[in-house]
From Swiss-Prot:
Annotated Basic and acidic residues bias: 24-38
Gene responsible for this protein: PRM2
Subunit structure: Interacts with TDRP.
A GO molecular function held by the record: DNA binding
Membrane-spanning ranges: none
Chief site of localization: nucleus
Keyword Nucleus assigned: yes
Protein name: Protamine-2
Modified residues (Phosphoserine): 8
Region called Disordered, residue ranges: 1-115
Gene Ontology cellular component terms for the protein in this record: nucleosome; nucleus
Length: 115
């Protein structure tokens, strides 16, 4: 635990109270109380963690900023990984081909766009 450093009477010139609080020299053994108003807000507050440019990386994946990619990009990458194969007729994959991502399908259905 870190305590605040209080100047001894020999370090400070006589007649000056360090922070302007009365009674500080009367009880030097008490640690000063920290209040949220006294803490300067500089990128980090008294609550929570500091998330600005927080790096997250593992041995496998070095640090890269997370960026949202389009579904089309992911589909293209996924399709390039394996050998191209034709979908089997009658399976759910065959009927779903070329219809976009699930989120877009759900959004279209909710809008009630019927012809």
């Amino acid at each position: 635990m870190v305590r605040c450093h209080v100047k001894s009477p020999t370090e400070s010139p006589p007649g000056q109270q360090g922070s302007g609080q009365q009674g500080e020299t009367e009880h030097p053994d008490q640690a000063r109380e920290l209040r949220p108003e006294d803490i300067p807000v500089y990128g980090r507050t008294h609550r929570g963690r500091y998330h600005y440019r927080h790096r997250s990386h593992t041995r496998r994946r070095p640090y890269r900023r997370r960026r949202r990619r389009a579904c089309r990009h992911r589909r293209r990458r996924r399709g390039a990984a394996g050998p191209p194969c034709a979908p089997i007729p009658g399976t759910p994959q065959a009927s779903r081909q070329g219809s976009g991502c699930r989120r877009m399908r759900r959004r279209r259905r909710r809008c009630g766009r019927q012809l």
